[in-house]
């Protein structure tokens, strides 16, 4: 499978209540069957609201004064705030991301009908160009990277593999590539501190190991190690965010970072094996790293 997307695609994140307009007004959104069943079986105080404000015959959200029944006065979605992001229907979860699928090809774009997407598109200073990923999706690449590394590492502390499994299962199991991309975008939006932490972590790995290349000439290996370690921590962050029902704080981040660091850096065997895999295993090629960055 090949998939293409414009170079500015990853710049988008929903600005929610700060948006000058709302995508939930004047648009009769059709609810997909899977989500409709979730609404039918939803338990809790919000059940009556779902039952009353959905047109079950037409499979759409009711509208009042051309506004979705679940759009509150702050232009935020009550389904999201009361029931959680997992209860959003496919259209609400994906918009303004637009996907067209053909045989062997998936085209992903941002809809011009979204003010923030329009701003990003029209603010580009260079001609637009498309990026293409081939074969493995980013989710598949990450899964294969974990499967390559984890069995090769000695476990220093009891519970480490269980710690990984709980978080990675939350991220990878029962989610397609579109859900995976959305979940990571959602985390980045609701946890903006990650952008600063990402830079701090990348600098840490570079600062700690890059100059060691004067002894073994493995410059690219050190760089790849820094990138992969930072990306792995991000995957664990998103998995923790999902495991904790869309909650994540600094203590979560601290726990992930120090436990990951201990398992890797407190063992010469693990450090050497990690760098050996960066150097010799094709799954960590620069081509693959560019696909997931």
Name each model feature, range by range.
Residues 17, 27, 71, 80, ...:
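Structured loops at beta-to-helix junctions and adjacent beta-edge loops in soluble globular domains
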Residues 11-18, 127, 201-206:
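Short, compositionally biased low-complexity segments
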Residues 134-293:
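Hydrophobic, aromatic-lined core segments that form the binding pocket/scaffold
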Residues 83-134:
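Internal, well-ordered alpha/beta segment that forms a basic, Gly-enriched binding/recognition surface
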Residues 20, 25, 29-30, 74, ...:
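Secreted/processed peptides and extracellular or luminal domains of membrane proteins
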Residues 27-65:
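N-terminal, Lys/Arg-enriched amphipathic/low-complexity engagement segments
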Residues 1-19, 51-89, 106-109:
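Immediate flanking context of iron-sulfur cluster ligation sites
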Residues 80-84, 102, 217-225:
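Conserved aromatic-histidine-acidic binding/catalytic patches
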């Amino acid at each position: 499978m090949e998939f293409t997307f414009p170079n500015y695609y990853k710049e988008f994140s929903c600005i929610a209540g700060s948006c000058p307009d709302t995508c939930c007004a004047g648009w009769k959104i059709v609810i997909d069957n899977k989500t409709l069943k979730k609404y039918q079986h939803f338990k809790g105080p919000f059940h009556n609201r779902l039952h009353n404000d959905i047109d079950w015959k037409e499979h759409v959200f009711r509208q009042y004064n051309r506004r979705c029944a679940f759009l509150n006065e702050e232009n935020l979605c009550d389904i999201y705030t009361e029931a959680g992001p997992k209860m959003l229907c496919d259209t609400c979860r994906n918009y303004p991301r637009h996907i067209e699928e053909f045989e062997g090809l998936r085209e992903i774009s941002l809809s011009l009908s979204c003010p923030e997407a329009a701003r990003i598109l029209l603010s580009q200073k260079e001609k637009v160009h498309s990026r293409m990923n081939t074969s493995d999706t980013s989710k598949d690449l990450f899964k294969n990277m974990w499967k390559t590394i984890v069995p090769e590492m000695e476990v220093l502390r009891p519970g480490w593999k269980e710690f990984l499994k709980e978080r990675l299962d939350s991220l990878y199991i029962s989610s397609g590539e579109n859900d995976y991309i959305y979940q990571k975008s959602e985390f980045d939006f609701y946890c903006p501190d990650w952008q600063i932490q990402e830079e701090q972590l990348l600098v840490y790995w570079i600062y700690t190991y890059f100059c060691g290349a004067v002894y073994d000439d493995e410059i690219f290996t050190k760089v790849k190690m820094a990138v992969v370690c930072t990306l792995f921590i991000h995957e664990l962050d998103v998995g923790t965010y999902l495991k904790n029902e869309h909650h994540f704080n600094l203590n979560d981040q601290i726990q992930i970072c120090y436990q990951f660091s201990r398992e890797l850096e407190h063992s010469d065997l693990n450090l050497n094996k990690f760098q050996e895999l960066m150097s010799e295993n094709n799954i960590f090629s620069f081509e693959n790293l560019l696909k997931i960055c």
